[in-house]
Amino acid sequence: ALPIFKNNFNVEVLIPSEYKILKDTSTLFWATYNPDKEEVIKQLLVFSFIPKSANLQQEVLQKTDSILAQYLKGAKQEQYVKIESEFPPYYNNNIYKGIWKLEKGFMGGPLLAKTYFVGDKIIVSVGLVFDPNSRKRKHLKILEAIL
């Protein structure tokens, strides 16, 4: 595991070595776990923004939805990942727990997001799990530790 985020986001997070880093810029960090022999996909995304709204929780969810739709696409062009609006995420102590779904598709699973306040920015770290054949608790506990 390597500390990755200290330079770009001023938050130190350890990424397990089995994750593949897909993007590491000053605006977005994205890593994925997608082994060949398992039907498991885990995504980690970290981004930041300067809040402009009085409703901070809503703004965090909107920004997260926007990032998910931009980077996590399905097999078809019109498919993208979004936060499931039928079950709004539960929020407590800067942690959001909810469900994601593939728009115009048949995938979904748990979503976990943590927010950190650094100066005038909010840093959002998001983890998603897709594992249709098992319970997700173990995956979520690992994501919670990473984020």
Q: What is the predicted function of each stretch?
A:
Residues 33-37, 101-102, 128-129:
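Secondary-structure transition/turn motif
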Residues 1, 13, 19, 123-147:
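Surface-exposed amphipathic alpha-helical segments
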Residues 1-3, 35-36:
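Charge-rich, low-complexity N-terminal segments
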Residues 16-69:
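Secretory pathway targeting signatures of secreted, lumenal, and periplasmic proteins
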Residues 21, 31, 98, 124-125:
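Short hydrophobic/aromatic-rich beta-strand segments that constitute the beta-sheet cores
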Residues 69-122, 134:
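Signature of long, low-cysteine stretches enriched in small and polar/charged residues
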